Every structure is written in structure tokens, then in C-alpha cells.
Amino acid sequence: MRSAQVYRWQIPMDAGVVLRDRRLKTRDGLYVCLRDGEREGWGEISPLPGFSSETWEEAQTALLTWVNDWLQRSDALPEMPSVAFGASCALAELTGVLPAAADYRAAPLCTGDPDDLVLRLADMPGEKIAKVKVGLYEAVRDGMVVNLLLEAIPDLHLRLDANRAWTPLKAQQFAKYVNPDYRPRIAFLEEPCKTRDDSCAFARETGIAIAWDESLREPDFVFEAQEGVSAVVIKPMLTGALDKVRAQVAAAHALGLTAVISSSIESSLGLTQLARIAAWLTPGTLPGLDTLHLMQTQQVRPWPGSALPCLNRDELERLL
């Protein structure tokens, strides 16, 4: 016997969370809980403002339609990426496809203070990897900060994310301030320039490896070996159903690229599922999931070790 619940939620964010030049005051989303007999599966649907093509309201309409179809024994997944992902996660839990084992390690987001980063990395097992957002300030400043971090912590590897912020000139200004001897310890720089051609040229000219992120979601993107490209960063909430995520990981691995499962600022429930997806599809690769600290609360499933309070399902607004 199939049954389902849909919940709507809104989580206050810490001050200072800015996405694409707009402040994110709350993180808005939905949960779906599917039941079939004794089995249960959850999924999160939370389009990311400025990045997702669909809005929260559009996702809600599509989710409710899909749930009603599922209750009538239709198993086709919705097209909308966030709804397809959340629905497929709920189904994967329900059927036991999504393993319980999780990789709760996370590459810490660094604000540029090497002393703070040293403390955060001290307890980190294995490779020391951190992430730095670049492109928000002057490119020269970014280059100096990255150089300082790599100089201060000799076994550090950095993942950098520019979100296509730089012109080719700005990207070169950044690289100029990073010691060539340290550049191999930049694991990758996500999407430095506005076009893929400019980003590839930057990688060839500087020896700094790059990764694709936004490009994966463009209709003309194809997986191919390219000089200077070392990784792809996959954000499942923006990608679609789990099968599509699996296909992208497989395509990347077939080319010898690193595939990184990354957060779209999901709630704790969504983050714990991403940790499981990472352990399942990209074992041994540190996922990019260090975003829970941007929120003021957790929901339904807490992240291990987090001190944030956690709401249970009864405290959420139920739509169905």
C-alpha cells in the first residue's frame, strides 16, 4: 500500500550568505516521504535561487503532481531537476538502492585566515583539502590569499571556485600572484572565466588545473578529454535524477577525471543523503558538503557532530 507526505520548510540563513549578487536570507524547500508497506524513503527538493531554472513554487506544483501520480502506481520521474532528484532519492531509499554508508568528511570552506584553516585541518584524516571562493574580490587579492595559504600549509591542496567571475585578464592577474611552485597544489579551479574556451586557455597558459561545474548543465556540453581539465563538480540538486548523476560520474571517471559531489546548500537531510551518494558513487573523493554552518537549524536528520538544533518532521508544515 503506497502512501506519501509532502512538507514545506524555510530555514533562516546566517547573515552574509550571498549568491549571484543577492543575499540569501532563508533556504526554502520541500521534503517528500514515500511509504510502501513497511518501507520508507525521503527526498529533498530545494531549488537554489540564481542557479536552478525552476522556482520553489514551481517545484512544489510539480512535486505534488508527481506524488499523486506515484500513488496511482506511475513510476515515471518528473523532468524538473530538483524534483527529479528529490523524488529519485526517496525512491532509492524506499527500494534500498541508496546505500546507508556515508562520507561525512567535508572540504572546509576557508575565508582566507591560515591560522583558522590550520586548526580546522588538524583533525582532518588523510589528505588536507580545503575550498576557497574566489572572484568575489579583486583577482590580485585572491591570488595573494591563495598563495599565502599554500605557503603556510605545505601539505595543503586547494579547490577554488570562481563561478565564472573573471575575464581572461583578471584570471591572469590572479595567477600572477600564485607562485608557480605552488600551482600543482591547486587541485582545481572551478570555471575561472565566462566561457569554456577562455577557461581552457587559462589552464594551458598557467598550468593551473580547472574543473567544470555550471558547464555540465549547459545543453551543448559533452564529456571529452581536454588539456588542463582535471575534474567535474556535480551538484545533484541542479542536475536531476540519481540516474543522471550516476551517468555523469561514470562519464567523468571514464576520462580519468575526478568527480566531486557538491552541495547546493541543502538542509541537513539533503546533505546526509549527498554524503551517502558520495560514498557510493565517488568513494575516496572528498565531497564538497561544508555548507551546514550557513544555516541556523537542522531538520529531520542531523549531520553527525553538528551542534545546531534539529527539528523533527512534526514541526514542519505539511502539504499532503
Curated annotation (Swiss-Prot):
Pathway: Quinol/quinone metabolism; 1,4-dihydroxy-2-naphthoate biosynthesis; 1,4-dihydroxy-2-naphthoate from chorismate: step 4/7; Quinol/quinone metabolism; menaquinone biosynthesis
UniProt EC number: 4.2.1.113
InterPro entries attached to this UniProt entry: Enolase-like_C_sf, Enolase-like_N, Enolase_C-like, Mandelate_racemase_C, OSB_synthase_MenC1, OSBS_N
Substrates-to-products reaction catalysed: (1R,6R)-6-hydroxy-2-succinyl-cyclohexa-2,4-diene-1-carboxylate = 2-succinylbenzoate + H2O
A Pfam match: MR_MLE_C
Residue numbers binding Mg(2+): 161, 190, 213
Magnesium listed as a keyword: yes
Keyword Lyase: yes
Active site: 133 (proton donor), 235 (proton acceptor)
The protein's required cofactors: a divalent metal cation
Job of this protein: Converts 2-succinyl-6-hydroxy-2,4-cyclohexadiene-1-carboxylate (SHCHC) to 2-succinylbenzoate (OSB).
UniProt name for this protein: o-succinylbenzoate synthase
Organism expressing this protein natively: Salmonella arizonae (strain ATCC BAA-731 / CDC346-86 / RSK2980)
Gene: menC
